[in-house]
């Protein structure tokens, strides 16, 4: 029972931060959204809102990391795979009324210079996405340096395009980023997927078609 209450709190906190960021979310908001009394929040998270946010962001980051591989797994052409990631992200954003923003990205810029615990947490999530994505693309047959470059460019382009898409209420930023990023990699083969990699983006990112 304690675990389900804890998970309900983290899920509610992540969902609230996805829509509102960190500063606009209060403990009463989390209690109301999770169905847990305020006392339960402090029982499970004596560190209060910062501790809840940190745990929620790490949990959400692990879930979002599974999204990119979920799209890429079935593709054998890197360019087509990258285009598919952005197309799926655009579909997800439009389908949620441009509200499907990753909580990690929503909070990261907001707290980077003000709350060190959360800066470290979001930095850790991004690092996991980049390292996991690099390992994933290496497993799919890309040279190490290319795998890293593709992952960094993919995550960076997605995060930036999500912000523009949400602000403009338009999928154009995602579709344009997908066209430009995928074009140089058309015809680049991806090796068949053999085994899953724990922590690989798309298996951690929130991310990333993590319509963040």
Residue ranges and their predicted role:
Residues 53, 80-84, 95-117:
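Amphipathic alpha-helical segments used for helix-helix packing
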Residues 68-100, 139, 150-154:
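Hydrophobic alpha-helical connector segments
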């Amino acid at each position: 029972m304690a675990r389900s209450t804890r998970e309900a709190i983290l899920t509610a906190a992540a969902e609230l931060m996805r829509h509102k960021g960190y500063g606009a979310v209060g403990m009463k908001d989390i209690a109301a959204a999770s169905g847990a009394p305020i006392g339960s929040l402090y029982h499970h998270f004596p560190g209060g809102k910062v501790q809840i946010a940190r745990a929620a962001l790490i949990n959400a980051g692990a879930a979002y990391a599974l999204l990119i591989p979920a799209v890429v797994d079935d593709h054998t052409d890197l360019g087509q795979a990258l285009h598919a990631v952005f197309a799926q992200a655009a579909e997800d954003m439009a389908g949620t009324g441009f509200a499907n923003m990753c909580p990690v990205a929503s909070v990261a810029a907001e707290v980077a210079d003000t709350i060190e615990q959360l800066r470290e947490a979001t930095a850790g999530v991004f690092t996991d996405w980049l390292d996991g994505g690099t390992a994933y693309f290496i497993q799919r047959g890309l040279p190490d340096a290319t795998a890293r470059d593709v992952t960094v460019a993919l995550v960076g382009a997605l995060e930036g395009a999500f912000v523009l898409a949400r602000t403009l209420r338009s999928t154009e930023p995602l579709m344009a980023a997908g066209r430009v990023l995928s074009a140089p990699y058309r015809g680049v083969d991806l090796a068949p997927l053999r085994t899953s990699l724990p922590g690989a983006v798309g298996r951690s990112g929130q991310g990333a078609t993590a319509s963040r």
